């Protein structure tokens, strides 16, 4: 393996695209909490003073969409003097939702490979390809660049919410570049944080002085706490640390950029370290394999790495609309596997049920929003859907399945 630098980014919950993801998933949570059979494809658009809900929803649930949208925007932090042209109390909220197409509904409700097995009776909600990935670079079996980028973004939001740095505003981005030697991460090359802030900080109005103060504050209150338990830590001498490289970041959020659901799919997954099938997650109910099958693919890949059958594993699944069973399953271990990829593929087929209804049942995806107090999917809409130690995600719990793979693989070793 060659030496290289790999870079991944994350964004905070106040980023315009992430506002949209959270609103779409808050709608999904609310609908599933009241009607677990809801069919949801909810898209959100935000701009200065405007939030638009659109898409297709079929549900028995009755929902005050406008009230819910304002609640999410307020909780993110867009309210009052720091709203910046996008106040939760005064922004316009437009709702333009249709029902799910009966042609799609028919294929999902009654798969073409239907039989007495109930899990065969639910077809995939669309065609498509999904990837799952895991590697042994971090305890959560995620690539280090995206893992660290999320840590920084989470800590950045935390010090804002807790008013440790009360000049911070909701919009922000992080980016991390990691040095690899022979394919193994060895040091943090660069950390970049762009964070929205007030025009004046502690009486300081000079642009360069403000930037320098933010840089010093972020190193102490964001970078060091976010990395204190890592084996690979940033160094004042060796790690390049960039903050707001344009000089200032006062105008942000939807006032600075329009936002749209599903535009941060690489942030949501593996930071570009693994392939992506192109389908977004947020606002989609579990019958949409863009979401549920991507979770299942991660579950498979993580189980393989946890079982130490490979140091890296990437799993591709493909589906046809209205068909229950995957069209194809592919596994790649990049030369790190201890058994052949053909044998690994057979292990997957024999130990994982990857039909949509089986995935939904395995992870209890329809019922989790209600069980979690009305909020489950929204929590995944910021800071990644995978490797989340702060959330109890069923596709991340692989102890039992990895042990099963260890036993099943013994005859192949």
From Swiss-Prot:
Catalysed reactions, as listed in the record: L-methionine + ATP + H2O = S-adenosyl-L-methionine + phosphate + diphosphate
- Provide the binding site for K(+): 43
The Gene Ontology CC terms held by the record are: cytoplasm
What residues bind L-methionine, as annotated?
56, 100, 257, 288
Keyword entries, A-Z: ATP-binding, Cytoplasm, Magnesium, Metal-binding, Nucleotide-binding, One-carbon metabolism, Potassium, Transferase
Q: Quaternary arrangement and interactors, per the entry?
A: Homotetramer; dimer of dimers.
The UniProt family comment states:
Belongs to the AdoMet synthase family.
**UniProt-recorded name of the protein:** S-adenosylmethionine synthase
The source organism is: Prochlorococcus marinus subsp. pastoris (strain CCMP1986 / NIES-2087 / MED4)
Q: What is the lineage of its organism?
A: Bacteria, Bacillati, Cyanobacteriota, Cyanophyceae, Synechococcales
- Tell me the name of the encoding gene: metK
């Amino acid at each position: 393996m060659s030496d290289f630098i790999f870079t991944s980014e994350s964004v905070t919950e106040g980023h315009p695209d992430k506002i949209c993801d959270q609103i779409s998933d808050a709608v999904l949570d609310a609908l599933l909490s009241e009607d677990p059979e809801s069919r949801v494809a909810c898209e959100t658009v935000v701009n200065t003073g405007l939030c638009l809900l659109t898409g297709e929803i079929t549900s028995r649930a009755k929902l005050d969409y406008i009230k819910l949208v304002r609640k999410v925007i307020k909780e993110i932090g867009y309210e009052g003097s720091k709203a910046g042209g996008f106040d939760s109390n005064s922004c316009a909220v437009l709702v333009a939702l249709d029902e799910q197409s009966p042609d799609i509904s028919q294929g999902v409700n009654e798969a073409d490979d239907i039989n007495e097995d109930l899990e065969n009776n639910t077809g995939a909600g669309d065609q498509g390809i999904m990837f799952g990935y895991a590697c042994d670079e971090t305890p959560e079996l995620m690539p280090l660049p995206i893992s660290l980028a999320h840590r920084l973004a989470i800590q950045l939001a935390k010090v804002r919410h807790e008013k440790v740095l009360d000049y911070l505003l909701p919009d922000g981005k992080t980016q991390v570049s990691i040095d690899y030697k022979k394919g193994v991460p060895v040091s943090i090359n660069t950390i970049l944080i762009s964070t929205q802030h007030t025009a004046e900080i502690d009486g300081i109005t000079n642009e360069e002085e403000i930037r320098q103060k933010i840089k010093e504050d972020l190193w102490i209150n964001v970078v060091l706490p976010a990395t204190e338990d890592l084996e690979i830590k940033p160094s004042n001498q060796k790690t390049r640390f960039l903050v707001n490289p344009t000089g200032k970041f006062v105008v942000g959020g939807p006032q600075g950029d329009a936002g749209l659901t599903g535009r941060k799919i690489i942030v949501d997954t593996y930071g570009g370290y693994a392939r992506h099938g192109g389908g977004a997650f947020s606002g989609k109910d579990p019958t949409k394999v863009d979401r549920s099958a991507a979770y299942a693919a991660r579950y498979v890949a993580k189980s393989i790495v946890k079982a130490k059958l490979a140091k890296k594993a990437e799993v591709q699944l493909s589906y046809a609309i209205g068909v229950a069973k995957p069209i194809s399953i592919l596994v790649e271990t990049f030369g790190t596997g201890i058994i052949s990829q053909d044998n690994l593929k057979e292990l997957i087929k024999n130990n994982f049920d990857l039909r949509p209804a089986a995935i939904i049942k395995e992870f209890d995806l329809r019922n989790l929003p209600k069980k979690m107090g009305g909020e489950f999917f929204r929590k995944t809409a910021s800071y990644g859907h995978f490797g989340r130690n702060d959330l109890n995600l069923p596709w991340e719990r692989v102890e039992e399945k990895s042990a099963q793979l260890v036993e099943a693989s013994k005859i192949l070793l």
